[in-house]
Amino acid sequence: MKDRYILAFETSCDETSVAVLKNDDELLSNVIASQIESHKRFGGVVPEVASRHHVEVITACIEEALAEAGITEEDVTAVAVTYGPGLVGALLVGLSAAKAFAWAHGLPLIPVNHMAGHLMAAQSVEPLEFPLLALLVSGGHTELVYVSEAGDYKIVGETRDDAVGEAYDKVGRVMGLTYPAGREIDELVHQGQDIYDFPRAMIKEDNLEFSFSGLKSAFINLHHNAEQKGESLSTEDLCASFQAAVMDILMAKTKKALEKYPVKTLVVAGGVAANKGLRERLAAEITDVKVIIPPLRLCGDNAGMIAYASVSEWNKENFAGWDLNAKPSLAFDTME
């Protein structure tokens, strides 16, 4: 049987990434060009800056991904691309490159939901058994997703306001930490103590919804009031207290979801899945189901995860036409 190679593109936010997946399960390359340094001084991603960076490096990323995989353009069997959710300008760069490559070589174009990519990155650890439940935690999303089979996703719970990663960045900015703040907060946690009583919104309510705006506001108010009084607060203790509240919320809702949906596997994915505190809590408290977390290199935005997610779409022959457009607000229930 002839080998099949998927060339995947991911440009939904501030990472330009191109990857090659061989025979559905062997990731040969996963090139990522990060823009973090360009956005640090703004304290967040500037859409126009992100789009321009994508344009500047996308061709080099394609060439590097093919070279690292040891294949040529003629060896590629299909092209996969993120078409949402994300920043519209950033998405369009990846879409344009992917469609141009597919059209030039007469290849099928596979549309992939960015969040499905995060979820299916777990396939790199071991073959997934369905049905399963997934906790997706990133800068833009906090969702509990029930997956009955590969490619069949149903959101059963989500945030009503801020995403968890967004909350990390906002409190990090208040403390003067560098963007993105998640990693630094996670490191400072282990040097501090949980001494500030921050709210755990909706933690006792009988639903699978999340809310982090109250926690964020309480944190900002505490910090602001201390500054007004000339008081000094321990950054380490603030981080420890904030993260303890976040983890209590995530764990409570995840446990409730596992009670409602009795599955054998829990996937935890997205940029925040790299958090040490979250991994420690999962290992200690979720012991009756298998917990699968992608390796650190596949937690952030990358094209490797898009390649993994595209396999089920290819098997269903869910190909896109040349009119495929960016859908910045794409949800699981509105996929192509």
From Swiss-Prot:
Belongs to the KAE1 / TsaD family. Keywords: Acyltransferase, Cytoplasm, Iron, Metal-binding, Transferase, tRNA processing. HAMAP family: TsaD. Binds 1 Fe(2+) ion per subunit. GO terms for biological process: tRNA threonylcarbamoyladenosine modification. Pfam families: TsaD. It comes from the Bacteria. It comes from Streptococcus pneumoniae serotype 19F (strain G54). The keyword tRNA processing applies. This is tRNA N6-adenosine threonylcarbamoyltransferase. Required for the formation of a threonylcarbamoyl group on adenosine at position 37 (t(6)A37) in tRNAs that read codons beginning with adenine. Is involved in the transfer of the threonylcarbamoyl moiety of threonylcarbamoyl-AMP (TC-AMP) to the N6 group of A37, together with TsaE and TsaB. TsaD likely plays a direct catalytic role in this reaction. InterPro entries: ATPase_NBD, Gcp-like_dom, KAE1/TsaD, Peptidase_M22_CS, TsaD. It catalyses: L-threonylcarbamoyladenylate + adenosine(37) in tRNA = N(6)-L-threonylcarbamoyladenosine(37) in tRNA + AMP + H(+). It is found in: Cytoplasm. The keyword Ligase does not apply. The lineage of its organism: Bacteria, Bacillati, Bacillota, Bacilli, Lactobacillales. GO terms for cellular component: cytoplasm. Substrate binds at residues 136-140, 169, 182, 186, 275. Its EC number is 2.3.1.234.
